Every structure is written in structure tokens, then in C-alpha cells.
Amino acid sequence: MLIIETLPLLRQQIRRLRMEGKRVALVPTMGNLHDGHMKLVDEAKAHADVVVVSIFVNPMQFDRPEDLARYPRTLQEDCEKLNKRKVDLVFAPSVKEIYPNGTETHTYVDVPGLSTMLEGASRPGHFRGVSTIVSKLFNLVQPDIACFGEKDFQQLALIRKMVADMGFDIEIVGVPIMRAKDGLALSSRNGYLTAEQRKIAPGLYKVLSSIADKLQAGERDLDEIIAIAGQELNEKGFRSDDIQIRDADTLLEVSENSKRAVILVAAWLGDARLIDNKLVELA
């Protein structure tokens, strides 16, 4: 496995792979890798000859400096996991390598609408940071496919739209959420939970599933469903942050024409803001 930290060396390797006619898959990450990331890697390996994993804690997508400062940097452990998975290339640049003149004056990519609604409304600038770094990685790695987790549902929708709008010739593969046995979605943020909070955390998925059951049973008073779910989260020890039921294909309000809904839940548990989602077919 090759570990690359600079843009010139990355470009050199990508040119070589292209000359050899290799099909390249990209898995963009911020490191602190867990089994959910390994599922993305496995999916990438199934679709391509060569897998490139990027590890970069992107300052542009953090709306709170304290979150950026405390985000775990575990490059050595991450590379050991990726080596066992037989990843071909790890791109782990410094912030200076990606943003040589800082982030304030750096050219950015914005996806209107999707970047400021829902999760974007509570995290100003977050999705602009995501779309900027992902577009830069697409330009550098020139992958044939790129794999993203469905846990970050809005992010996946945003990337798909950016790819369509910008004309990137890249197949975007969404990989289903990987869960612990008790239902908790795997996430780097779970590492912020205390042992006691970890016992409470599966309650998020239980509330999510309860909403899904109501929708599948034909209930359509969404305001009431959301209000009850928020109360249930608070009773379980969470601080409910945002609960949305949206059209899964547009992320707009559910309408009579909606065929699928996505339930999007965000809640604080101690210092960890946990997110999860679930798709529901509407009869």
C-alpha cells in the first residue's frame, strides 16, 4: 500500500494508473476509520481495479473550531486497517497541501438549496466545505467511481447533484448504513460517548423505527409524529436537535406525489451530535 502526502506524487501515480487502463475507485474520509468505512472500501474494491482512500480532516466543513480541534487524528491506525483491507493507495495530505493560502480566500464549490437546507441550516458552511473538498479530490484522483455512506443522506444527495451539475464523469455509489447489533449507526462521533451514553445511544434508532412504523401504517400527520418523536428522544436522555420527514428523492416536503420518504434525525447525547436516517416506501 502506497501512502502519498503531496499533490505532485498523487498526480504522478494517477497518470500511471490511467496509462495502465486501471479502473479507479475513491473513498473520501476524514480518518478515524471504523467498520462502516471498511464497508465503503469493500464496495469500492468490488467496483474497481484500484482503490484510493483519502484521509483529510477538512477544516472548511467544520462550523465550530472546537469540533475541528478535537476531531481524532488516527492516521497510523487508519493505515494499518486499510493495509489489511489491501487498499492500493492512501492520500493523506496536510491542510497546507490542500489549502496553501488558507481557507478564507480559497475558491469554493457551493450547491444552492441542498447546502443550506435541513442539516445545512444548523451547520452554516458545512456542506460548502464538503462539496469543495470532494470536487477537489475528484479533480486530483479522477476516479471512475466514488463511494459514500448513506448515513449522511443529505451529503450523498448533495454530491450526486454536484456531479450532475458539474459534469463529472464519475459513478456515485451509495453504501447502506452499517449498524452495531443494538441498531446504533456506526460513526466516528460514537467515540465521544461515555460508557453510559453508549447504552442510551441505540434509542435513536428505536425512535427512528417508530416513526417509520407509523408512516407505513398510513399515519400522515407529520407534525404530530415529529412532536411525539422529539419528546421520546428527550425522555430517553437525548437532546432532540432536528427531526424531518422529507421526500427521499428531492428532500423537499412530503407531498401526495411522494413515493418514498426519508426520516432524518439528529440529536445530542452529551457532547456527541448523532445523526441517523431511514427510508420508507409510501403506499
UniProtKB/Swiss-Prot annotation:
Sections of the chain in a coiled coil: none
Matches recorded under Pfam families: Pantoate_ligase
GO CC annotation terms, alphabetical: cytosol
GO MF annotation: an example: ATP binding
Catalytic activity: (R)-pantoate + beta-alanine + ATP = (R)-pantothenate + AMP + diphosphate + H(+)
Role: Catalyzes the condensation of pantoate with beta-alanine in an ATP-dependent reaction via a pantoyl-adenylate intermediate.
Quaternary structure annotation from Swiss-Prot or TrEMBL: Homodimer.
Protein name in the entry: Pantothenate synthetase
